[in-house]
């Protein structure tokens, strides 16, 4: 591990030197690339330097155990447990930081939320979950845009598409893909019976032009007037755009902007993300076919979480996590849940790496 860490440190130092290179400073694209790579290594290098200092301190303190000076010997005995604990914690952190990075982690995301089983109650919950993610995005300092939204018959939303942009959005949001189940007594329930409804959340990394090539000849564009709640027209021009990708049958729609050109640009972002997601899923299926039968994967059809309102309980079925703070969670306080998912999958990846098996995808 030390050899690998020293290689990373040397690379970090070269990148740091490049930031003072006039040729790099004159090339904005190259400067951005160097800055981004250096930032990605900084946390690992800082941890390694701290680890190296702790090892040096530990070696020095262990030498004091053989000292003839009683005070030095007593100090060594007192200091050793803390230094060993610090060493072990840093080793664990470094192993995590050395895990292969998900190439999509730094990407923005396109988030789709769809009401599933449960009728009107599912639509109401779909809107609540959308608002939960919008509040979480606000806490993280991300930019959120609702690209498209279809209202439910009795409130809520049948489906919604949202973009989240900011620092490493996919690295956090990727754990949210799957079926979310809600158990509660609907406001219209007169007998006090608990109903179960479901929604589906899809989190796709936003693809760039270099990630996926789209043949314009494969796309049919349709324009229409934007509609609001209840289906009424909210625009007197044909600004809403629907794109149909004939090879895959994918259909995307955007009516957020008043400009048809802007809506078409947004719709193309959605289409590229869906095509990229299909390709990524194909790769994951090939790579992880044996493991997927045993461990949760973020599959769209996998029930990942239950929100039980009568018991004030959130359960994440993939990792066995239970949280009793539903009001806080629905208000956007989901960081602890996401962190628990990240920790679980990192531990699984370490196990797989040690055993030489396929790395879990999450």
UniProtKB/Swiss-Prot annotation:
What is the protein's name according to its record?
Answer: Peptide chain release factor 1
Cited function: Peptide chain release factor 1 directs the termination of translation in response to the peptide chain termination codons UAG and UAA.
Q: What is the native source organism of this protein?
A: Myxococcus xanthus (strain DK1622)
Q: Which residues carry this modification: N5-methylglutamine?
A: 232
What InterPro entries does the record point to?
PCRF (IPR005139), Pep_chain_release_fac_I (IPR000352), Pep_chain_release_fac_I_sf (IPR045853), Prokaryotic/Mito_RF (IPR050057), RF-1 (IPR004373)
Taxonomy, superkingdom: Bacteria
| Gene3D superfamilies, sorted | 3.30.160.20, 3.30.70.1660, 6.10.140.1950
One GO CC term on file: cytoplasm
Q: Which UniProt keywords apply?
A: Cytoplasm, Methylation, Protein biosynthesis
Any matching Pfam family: PCRF
Q: Tell me the gene name.
A: prfA
Where does this protein reside within or beyond the cell? Answer: Cytoplasm
GO MF, one term, reads: translation release factor activity, codon specific
Q: Posttranslational modification, per the record?
A: Methylated by PrmC. Methylation increases the termination efficiency of RF1.
What family does the entry list? Belongs to the prokaryotic/mitochondrial release factor family.
Q: Quick check: keyword Protein biosynthesis in the entry?
A: yes
Is Protein biosynthesis set as a keyword in this record? yes
What SUPFAM superfamilies does this protein map onto? Release factor
């Amino acid at each position: 591990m030390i050899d690998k860490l020293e290689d990373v440190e040397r690379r970090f130092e070269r990148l740091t030197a490049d930031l003072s290179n006039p040729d790099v400073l004159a090339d904005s694209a190259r400067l951005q690339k160097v800055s981004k790579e250096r930032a990605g290594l900084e946390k690992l290098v800082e941890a390694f330097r701290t680890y190296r200092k702790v090892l040096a301190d530990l070696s020095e303190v262990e030498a004091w155990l053989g000292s003839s000076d009683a005070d030095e010997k007593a100090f060594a005995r007192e200091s050793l447990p803390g230094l060993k604990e610090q060493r072990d914690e840093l080793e664990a952190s470094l192993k995590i930081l050395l895990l292969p990075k998900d190439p999509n982690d730094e990407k923005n995301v396109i988030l789709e939320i769809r009401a599933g089983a449960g009728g009107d109650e599912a639509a109401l919950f779909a809107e609540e979950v959308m608002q939960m993610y919008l509040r979480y995005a606000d806490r993280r300092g991300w930019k959120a845009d609702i690209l498209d939204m279809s209202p439910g018959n009795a409130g809520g939303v049948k489906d919604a598409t949202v973009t989240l942009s900011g620092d490493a959005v996919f690295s956090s949001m990727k754990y949210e893909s799957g079926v979310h189940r809600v158990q509660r007594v609907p406001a219209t329930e007169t007998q006090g019976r608990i109903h179960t409804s479901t929604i589906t959340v899809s989190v796709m990394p936003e693809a760039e032009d270099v990630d996926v090539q789209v043949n314009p000849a494969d796309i049919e564009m349709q324009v229409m007037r934007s509609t609001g709640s209840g289906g009424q027209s909210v625009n007197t021009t044909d600004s809403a755009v629907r794109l149909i990708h004939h090879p895959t049958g994918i259909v995307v729609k955007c009516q957020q902007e008043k400009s048809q050109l802007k809506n078409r640009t947004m719709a193309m972002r959605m289409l590229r993300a869906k095509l990229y997601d299909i390709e990524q899923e194909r790769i994951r299926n090939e790579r992880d076919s044996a493991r997927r039968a045993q461990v949760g994967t973020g599959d769209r059809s996998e029930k990942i979480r239950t929100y039980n309102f009568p018991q004030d309980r959130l359960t994440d079925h993939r990792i066995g996590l239970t949280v009793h703070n539903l009001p806080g969670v629905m208000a956007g306080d989901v960081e602890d849940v996401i962190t628990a998912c990240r920790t679980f999958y990192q531990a699984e990846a370490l196990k797989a790496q040690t055993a030489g098996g396929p790395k879990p995808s999450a």
